[in-house]
Amino acid sequence: MKGQKSYRIKKNDTVMVVTGKDKGKSGKVLRVIYKKDRAIVEKLNMIKRHMKPSQQNRQGGILEKESPIHISNLMLICAKCTDPTRVGYKVLDDNKKVRFCKKCNEVID
């Protein structure tokens, strides 16, 4: 059995949408869904759901919530150069594998 997939985008990263209805908008990643290759980004790709009243949602009605976006449609925004960038990996001197911005070579984490 294979282990968990590794993505260049992780929870709490700031990302920009490259394609789709929210193209050009940016937000913070709330969750990465590894099995479906998707991520949920804060206040992006909003959908409306009609909910019946229930124990958790007493009032019911129309709720707006974030819908998952495919990982390939997102680009990480570098904190230093503030541009959407491709992400690379490199191993530091202390044998720690880190992500880095391919535009400015700044270490991301």
Swiss-Prot record:
UniProt entry tagged with the keyword RNA-binding: yes
Keywords: Ribonucleoprotein, Ribosomal protein, RNA-binding, rRNA-binding
Gene Ontology biological-process annotations: translation
Cellular component aspect of the GO annotation: ribonucleoprotein complex; ribosome
Record-linked InterPro entries: KOW, Rib_uL2_dom2, Ribosomal_uL24, Ribosomal_uL24_CS, Ribosomal_uL24_KOW, Translation_prot_SH3-like_sf
Gene Ontology molecular function: any one: rRNA binding
Keyword Ribonucleoprotein on entry: yes
Pfam families: KOW, ribosomal_L24
SUBUNIT field: Part of the 50S ribosomal subunit.
PANTHER family: MITOCHONDRIAL RIBOSOMAL PROTEIN L24
Protein task: One of two assembly initiator proteins, it binds directly to the 5'-end of the 23S rRNA, where it nucleates assembly of the 50S subunit.
Family note: Belongs to the universal ribosomal protein uL24 family.
Annotated HAMAP family: Ribosomal_uL24_B (MF_01326_B)
Protein name according to UniProt: Large ribosomal subunit protein uL24
Encoding gene (name): rplX
